[in-house]
Amino acid sequence: MKSELALLLKALAFAARKHRDQRRKDAAASPYINHPIALANVLVKEGGVDDTAVLCAALLHDTLEDTATTRKELQRSFGTKIAAIVAEVTDDKRLPKARRKSLQVKHAARISREAKLVKLADKICNIRDVARRPPTGWDKRRQREYFDWAKRVIDRMRGVHPRLERAFDAAYSKRPGG
């Protein structure tokens, strides 16, 4: 237990360091680290998830995609399993955005259970954020498009965690109208 908690705190510190100069796209330019912390909170508080590897991966989920972190660095610091989960939920930023979004939908059914949990928490947090504090410049149409795309991703991996899926559905029910 003590070593699991230490690993979780190590992941939090690592993510905070890697994301230290990043901000969310909302009008308040919230500190980016709030997002990975929110994922871990959703997994624990709403999903009852206590798998340390999943929680660490949630905290680290955007480090490969949005920072200069390498998979090798994650493996050295957190082990192969956590690095693999993070890699499964990482988009290839070299691809055009539309292709990345399409691949997320396509691959959602094939990723590991652990990666599905992280992806589910990510989509819950993101659509809640879009509903409450949309990114600057996003009109209602763009917000609806994001909600609908997130639902297509989640629909491809239904059955992984019913409680979290209900949380996603509740968040999706707040889809902007218009």
Residue ranges of predicted features:
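Active-site helical microenvironments for divalent-metal-assisted chemistry
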Residues: 1-178
